Amino acid sequence: MSERGPAMPGQVSPDVLKHALTEHAAPERLVVARGLFTGPNAAVTDDLYARIASGRAHRERYALHLEKSATVDTNTYFGRFPASYFQRWTTVTEVQLKLAFEASGRARVLLRGSDSHGNARTIASTEVDGTGTVELSAQLNEFMDGGALWMECIAVGGPLKITDLEWTVAAPPSIRPAAIAICTFNRADDCANTLAAIAGDKGVLAGIDAIYVVDQGTDCVGTRPLFGEIAAQLGDKLVYLRQPNLGGSGGFTRGMCEVSSITEHANVILMDDDILCEPETVLRLNAFANLTPTPTIVGAQMLFLKNPRYLLAGAEEANLPRLKPGRWAPNSLHNSDMVKHKQKKRTDAQYNGWWSCLIPAEVIAAVGLPLPMFIKWDDVEYSLRAGAAGFPTVTLPNAGVWHAEFHWKDLDDWTHYFIVRNSLITAALHSDIDVSVTGTILTRVIAEAIFSMRYGLAHTMIRAVEDFLEGPSVLADGGGAAAASVRAERSEYAETTTHPGVETGELTSTLPPTRPAGFLPDKRRYYLVLAKRGVYQWLGRTIPGPVMIPAVDAHWWHVSLFDYAVVTDASQAGVRVLRRDKQKLKKLSRRLMKAMRQFRKQTPSLQAQYRAALPELSSRENWVRLFNGDPTG
C-alpha cells in the first residue's frame, strides 16, 4: 500500500509495528473502568460522572473531596459499572471496587447495585478512618436482565477524600494488542484535538500499541503544530498515512487492513476525527473486548455534542425492509437526558456506529473487510455480516463519546445518495427484499420530496436507486466519482443551496409570513393525502407564496400546500428557497416510475449478484487497489 505526500512524523517501520502489536502478559487484575469525577472539558456537566447527593463536595478528574456530612455517589452515566453486560457477554463472575481514601473522622464507603427495574440495594459496605484503601467485591450472578453497580461514600465525622477508584476483574491469560484507527478528511484541527485527548491520558495510552491516522484530505492534520507536538510525544506509536479520499469506509478500512495484516489477534478501535473524545471510553471498550469468550464488536454510545447530557440511543438496530437504520433496540433509552435517566434493563444491539467502535481482527479474518461504500451504512452492513458469522455486537453503556447530532443536519444533502444506495445494498445482502413493500416505501419517500418541491433531494434518491440497479460494479471505484457527480448534479437544483436568513427579503422581494404546520395526517389517510398533494402540485392548485416555514414544521405534507416556500435549513445556518416547477415535477415523476418498475423487476437477480460479489469487494486485494489510487482495477 503506497503513501503519498512528504515524509513527516508518523512514519513507522513494519518491524516496529509487528513488535508492538503482540500479545502482552496479563496483570493479576485487569482494570475495566476507572473512577472519573469530571468530564474532559467544561462543556460536559460533572453530573455525568459523580453525583453530590447531599452536603458540600468538590469534584476533580480523579479525586472527590467531601466536607463533613456530605454524600457522593457514582450512580451516573460514566460512574456506573454495567454489571448486566459483563454477566451476559463476558467470562467475568466477580468484580472488585478498589479506591484510596483520606478520612479526617469516620466515613462510610458502600458498593451499591440495582436490578432491571432500577431498585437500588447495598451489596457491601465498610467503615473507614484515617488513610488507606478499600476493596469491595460483588458477584456477577444477579444481573442477567439489567442492573449496574456504583460507589457511594459518606463523610460522617469529617472531611473525606477519595482517589484512585478502579473497577477490576480477574485478568484473562493474556492481553490482546490494541490499535486506534482515526479517519480524517479536512478536519485537521478536530483530528489533532482528538489525538491530543488520547495522548494526554497516560493510563489509556499504556494500553494502546499503535494509533493510525488515515488522512484523506487536502487540509492535512500533519501540517498542524499540535500534531507535531503529539507525534513527538507518541513516537513509534503514531502511524500517519495519506491516501485518496475513499470516505469513512475507506479511512477506517485502511486502519483495519493495516492492523489485521500484522496480527489476527488484535483489537482495532475505529474513531471519528470530529468527536469530543472521552479517553476513558477507549480503556473500557478495550478491557471489555479482552474478556468476551467470542470475538465481539464492542461499540461506544453516542452522546450529543451540542447537548452533552443527552444520549442518542442505548443500542440500535436496522429495519431493512423499510431501509431505516438507527431504530432503537428493545428497552433502549433514546434521546434521553442521562443526568435524569438510567439504563435499567440490558439492551442488545444489532450494530454500532463507528464514531467509536472496536472490531477484533478475528472478525476481519473471518468475514473480510468492510464494503467500499464511501459513507453511510458501512457500519450497519459490517455488524450484520459479522453477526451472521457468529460474532455479536455489544453497545457498552457508560462508554461514550460526543458526536454532532444528526438532527442538526438537513436531509436534503448529497450524502443522502449514499444513505439510499447503501441501504439497498445492505438489504440485498442481508435480507430477502420484498420488492412490493420496499418499492412502495421508496416510491412514497421520493414522491414526498417531489411534491414538497425538494427536487434536488428527489433527484439524489432516484439516482441512488438507479445506481443500485447497476449492480456490484457501482462499488468498484470506492465511491469518489459518485460523490463528485451527485454534488455537481445537485447544484442544478436551486433549492439545494442554503442562503443566509438575512437575505430572505432580497430572495423573495417581500417579507413572507410564517406558516407553522398543522396536524400530521391520519395513518389511514396517509396515501390519500400524498396523492392529493401530488395532484394539487401538478395542477397548480396550491396556496400562493412566499411563506416562511421553520425547520420543525417543514414536513412534506405541509410544504406541499404552497407553491413558494422559504424553509429553514435543519442546521439553522440559513434558509432554502423552494418553488414549484412543473417541468421538474413531471420529469422526476417519470424517472421515479421508471426506476421503480426496474427495481421490482431486477432486484431478485441483483440480490444474487451482490451476494456473489461480496467476497471480492471486501477482500484485501480490492482494498489495496483502492488505497493505491486505482479506481478501475
Where would I find each of the regions flagged by the language model?
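Donor nucleotide-sugar recognition loop
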Residues: 354-356, 365-384, 390-396, 414-415
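Active-site donor/metal-binding and catalytic loop motifs
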Residues: 163-170, 396-412
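Short beta-strand-to-loop acidic/aromatic patch adjacent to the donor-nucleotide binding site
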Residues: 263-276
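Cell-envelope/extracellular polymer assembly enzymes that use nucleotide-activated donors
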Residues: 177-179, 210, 381
